Amino acid sequence: MEKQKPFTLFVPPRLSSSQVSAVKPQTAGGDSNYFKTANKCTEGDFGVPFTMSSRENIDKDPAFQKLSILPMLEQVANSGSCHYQEGVNDSDFENSEPMSRLYSKLYKEAEKIKKWKVSIESELKQKENKLQENRKIIEAQRKAIQELQFENEKVSLKLEEEIQENKDLIKENNATIHWCNLLKETCARSAEKTNKYEYEREETRQVYVDLNSNIEKMILAFEELRVQAENARLEMHFKLKEDHEKIQHLEEEYQKEVNNKENQVSELLIQSAEKENKMKDLTFLLEESRDKANQLEEKTKLQDENLKELSEKKDHLTSELEDIKMSMQRSMSTQKALEEDLQIATKTISQLTEVKEAQMEELNKAKTTHSFVVTELKATTCTLEELLRTEQQRLEKNEDQLKLITVELQKKSNELEEMTKFKNNKEVELEELKNILAEDQKLLDEKKQVEKLAEELQEKEQELTFLLETREKEVHDLQEQVTVTKTSEQHYLKQVEEMKTELEKEKLKNTELTASCDMLLLENKKFVQEASDMALELKKHQEDIINCKKQEERLLKQIENLEEKEMHLRDELESVRKEFIQQGDEVKCKLDKSEENARSIECEVLKKEKQMKILESKCNNLKKQVENKSKNIEELHQENKTLKKKSSAEIKQLNAYEIKVSKLELELESTKQRFEEMTNNYQKEIENKKISEGKLLGEVEKAKATVDEAVKLQKEIDLRCQHKIAEMVALMEKHKHQYDKIVEERDSELGLYKNREQEQSSAKIALETELSNIRNELVSLKKQLEIEKEEKEKLKMAKENTAILKDKKDKKIQASLLESPEATSWKFDSKTTPSQNISRLSSSMDSGKSKDNRDNLRASAKSILPTTVTKEYTVKTPTKKSIYQRENKYIPTGGSNKKRKTAFEFDVNSDSSETADLLSLVSEEDVSNRLYDNNPPDSHLLVKTPKQTPLSLSTPASFMKFGSLKKMREDRWTTIAKIDRKRRLKEAEKLFS
């Protein structure tokens, strides 16, 4: 995956106190470039990219890719651009804020964004961790399910294996013969291996003793197993009898339960028929509600037509009332008070209606609210009557004043009478509309209550459907379980027993590890356990039958509970219907009372209108009433429109309810069908269980027969085991005699080996003495080397002194040579001392050839060292090349006699003078061939060294090698002995397993 580009914020560099902030003026459109350059500066020069270490993880997350952090930058950019524009307009940067403050603000905002990022990162990580935990839990659950499936398969495989084990008992006779052959083979192998295992005689004897003890233990164990098998057989007989009696009792109880269930099924069918009748009643009620809805629609249409007519009449009245408005202004003051009172009354009425709508859900509180409303209405009527009385008093005062005006107004009164007729008609129509609206409001309230009840019923129906579905699922699961029990009845008992045995084994592993050593005991115990397992299987099967019966009882109880719930719901529906009827009666009574009150008010209004015909004040009041009525008409138009919308919405809701009712009817039919299927399935299951009980009884009889056969086979096997044990004992005694003979032969061979070892130890002691002598000689030789080195140093000093004296004596030499030739001969002899000394040494060595080798070695070392070694080495073992170079320096060119030469070869890898650094003498011819490439050299060394015997120098190394080989052999014998012990033990276990 390619890494996304990190999100970097514009953060300018931090300016120190010494830095100066200077900004170059820019154009209005150059803000983006400014931010780009600033970003480059911050990232390149100052190295402050405000990106977190975990930023890549945020950028990779798709949730953060959608987040837009740019609005923060846009705000900063806009603020920067505003500052910049102000600066451009003012044309001086001194008055503006310094850039350092702006940078600090941006830096703070960037830090806030960082913190925000960190918090969001932590939240996302927590969510991811939760998701991962949930996934792990799901995977663990899946794995657990798979493991359970595998365990079930393993259990089935184990059952098959046990069946095969029963067949393998017949083949054990051939296996015992094979065991005998294996014993013979092991004896032959042990005879072959005794040649190798010479040092393990005592251990083999112990093994044979252990085998004898094991055989005795086996004999005792077989006798104990016989007794246990007889006891187990008797226990099995008693248990089978008890199980047979229990099965008979269970059959009787099962038949009784079947009869009870059949009676319950018949009762359930009767209850289902009653439920169908109730559903039919509900359908009739729904049809009635539909008819009522249609009637309401027709009423709304009529109201719309009446409103149109009223609007037309209103237009005519407005044109006529414009002339009367001037005369109506005087009575405005009195009318405003009345209007305010009416508005207060309307507000109180609206509040009461809202309270009623809120309290209609609780039917017990509805009566109290109505009583409060009635009292408030009475109070309002009393207030209105008092106001009317005050107005009458005022009118009486104004009558004296208006008598003069009556003459003028008689003409207008005729016109007003006509107007009043129209107004009366309109008022009647308005009152009718008001009544209709009140009825509509009541109907709406009732509809709301009906909707709420319907919603509650829907919720209850959903709960019932959910419960029915759960019950159906449970019933389906039970059916599947019953089918599974039918199919797994044959293997179920064995599975449960095996699971129990496995659990017992796991619990007793820590305490019974010692008991698992003897495999024969476990095999014989299996025969006893099989008989007990059959009894346990029968018990488990009986328990399963009881559990199935309990499950059936639970299902029946659940069905009864569901039926009771349905009855409760039906009772609730009936109570709700009764409540609706009661509420309708109460509403009708209230409407009648309101109509009577309205009629009484109308009578009073008519009386007042007659009085107003005489008085102008009454005319003015009438005009104002007309205006108010016109306003009310407009409000009524709006209310009618809202009512139309509400009625259309209610129609849609009714249609939806009808659809839901149809769905519920279908669901009820489906539930009936399912119930019938359930009853049929239960009947079939009962029949199948009866058949399975018969099969189980047959299987029990078969099991009894198999137990008897197993007892017979066990007796036969016991007899065969006794014969085989006797044969095994005889064979083991024969093998004992053979092994005793082999052990005696091996003892004699071991005695010979011990004698040889004693001889070798004596030779070893002699060789050790020789080594000690050689070491002493080497120490003496080293001391001689040191003495000779000191002599060489003295000779060097003498040579230096002679070289100094040569210069002084050069002039005297010629005279001395002429005078005394004998002196010259002496000098010549003194110059040629090294060669003469060598010749003398060689003659002495030739004369001493008849001596021992040790004396020759000492003489050769003494003769070689003064001639060859001229330098001192601090290293204990010098290299061969240095020795050869020293020898080449002092080799004389003259001479024709070929003689032997000795060279000391030191061990290169050693830095010490221990016994490992032995001197090895090499012949002169070998060294001369190396130095001169097979050319005939002159007689440069006159020392002859005789060839050493291999015993003198090679015996210590051979002795060391012999010791190491002996140790290696002993280690090998011990490892082979251990491996062979393990093999013997394994073979013995196989023989007796």
From Swiss-Prot:
| Region annotated Disordered, chain positions | 824-861
Which domain of life does the UniProt lineage start with? Eukaryota
Q: What is this protein called?
A: Synaptonemal complex protein 1
Q: Please name the Pfam families in this protein's record.
A: SCP-1
State the deletion phenotype. Answer: Mice appear generally healthy, but display complete sterility, due to defective meiosis during germ cell development. Ovaries and testes from mutant mice have strongly reduced weight relative to wild-type. Ovaries display an absence of growing follicles and oocytes. Testes show a complete lack of spermatids and spermatozoa. Synaptonemal complexes from mutant spermatocytes form normal axial elements, but lack the central element; chromosomes do not synapse properly, cross-overs are rare, and DNA repair after meiotic double-strand breaks is impaired.
Renumbered to this chain, the Basic and acidic residues biased-composition regions fall at 848-857
| Organism encoding this protein | Mus musculus
Question: In which tissues or organs does this protein occur?
Answer: Detected in testis. Detected in spermatocytes (at protein level).
